[in-house]
């Protein structure tokens, strides 16, 4: 994992704006044709990791369907929370929405800042801070993407998220 998008300031601003725990997260982003490997994983890592930033850990199962223009993935958490990821073909913007029981807040990712914000996290880590993303969270994100691939192959059936 190495997406810079979870560190985009707009995501934290949306989390702060909802005034409580995020119960629903919605993220959208690009789905191009990968030069190698799986396109949903190659491009989807950004949207999946943005969802993790909104929701935290605890994904239990994933359902995904390929609708042609987009792959739509739903992620169920064990406590009633859920997330939606739209991986949109030939669209190169990223953003989403955080929702609590009180309100919703939308965000767009400012692509002019994405590497700057990632480098700030890397610098802090090299200066002794804890890693900004744990190994467990990294694994869960990858497991969510693999579950999405399995779900698409299984006609949208729910696939459990493998745990580390």
What is the predicted function of each stretch?
Residues 79-81, 101-105, 157:
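Short acidic/polar mixed-charge low-complexity motifs
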Residues 86, 108, 161-162:
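Short linear motifs in exposed loops
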Residues 1-37, 47:
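A contiguous active-site-proximal alpha/beta segment in oxidoreductase catalytic domains
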Residues 25-93, 136-143:
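Rossmann-like dinucleotide-binding domain that binds NAD(P)(H)
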Residues 35-41, 106-110, 132:
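A short glycine-threonine-serine/GTX helix/turn-capping micro-motif
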Residues 125-164:
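C-terminal helix-rich "cap/oligomerization" subdomain common to oxidoreductases
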Residues 92-130:
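Interdomain hinge/lid region at the active-site interface
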Residues 11, 47-48, 115, 119, ...:
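A general structural signal for well-ordered alpha-helical segments in protein cores
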